[in-house]
Amino acid sequence: MSKNFNHEDFSHWIFDLDNTLYPASVNLFGQINTKMSNYIMKLVNVDQETAEKMRAEYWEKYGTSLAGLMQNYEIDPKDFLKVVHDIDFSVLPKDLDLLDALNNLPGRKLVYTNGTVPYAREVLKYRGLLSVFNEIYGIEDAGYIPKPFPEAFEIIFSKAKIVPNSSAMFEDEERNLVVPFKLGLKTILVSNVKSNEKYVNYSIKHLSDFLRRITSNPLK
């Protein structure tokens, strides 16, 4: 990088929720995927295999399966999200190490998820991280327009008063970092699969380790 990553230069830290603020190995989203497939089976009257294919195709094309269902079947997003977020959160372990690392970051800490705010609050509560975040934004705050679409980021970043060149975005999905990078944010992919995309400034496996590193010494 041409400039060091000095944590003192940042005023806003924006974190995705699912598979970013908890490990993907927990497979919380596996529960949600099952609920979504069941919803589609009943809505469209198709078998499980077809429903799972539709769910995946809608996610790829529309950003979320919900967005695809809204576009093609005009469903009530509130009803859908209430159903698919009725899951067992107790599989989420508390993470005091991550809590400590987040507490050491200066500035404001935000969660921005394609889930809902109530869902995000439940996840953070079970992880023991709820108290550390200043603001939480969900898909409902963007009029149900999901990441990775530019309109979604424009709406949320405007509401949160994000200053791009002094903000960082953490995500587990590469495609959700394209717009933040173009806007001037520092972008960090949290994934076991390393990224070499130019719009990913840092590709990391362990969030808490990375946060400790940047609060100890500036990164290049």
Regions found by a protein language model. Give the residues of each.
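Hydrophobic residues in well-ordered beta-strands that form the structural core
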Residues: 23, 111-113, 189
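N-terminal helical cap/lid subdomain that shapes the substrate entry/recognition surface
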Residues: 3-15, 20-97, 118
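Short glycine/serine/threonine/alanine-rich loop segments
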Residues: 46, 75, 107, 162, ...
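Well-formed, non-transmembrane alpha-helical positions, independent of function
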Residues: 68, 101-104, 179
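Asp-based, Mg2+/Mn2+-dependent phosphohydrolase catalytic module
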Residues: 1-10, 116-220
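Substrate-recognition element of Asp-dependent hydrolases with the DxDx(T/V) motif
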Residues: 79-93, 99-127, 133-139
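A generic structural signal for short
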Residues: 25, 54-55, 108-109, 141-142, ...
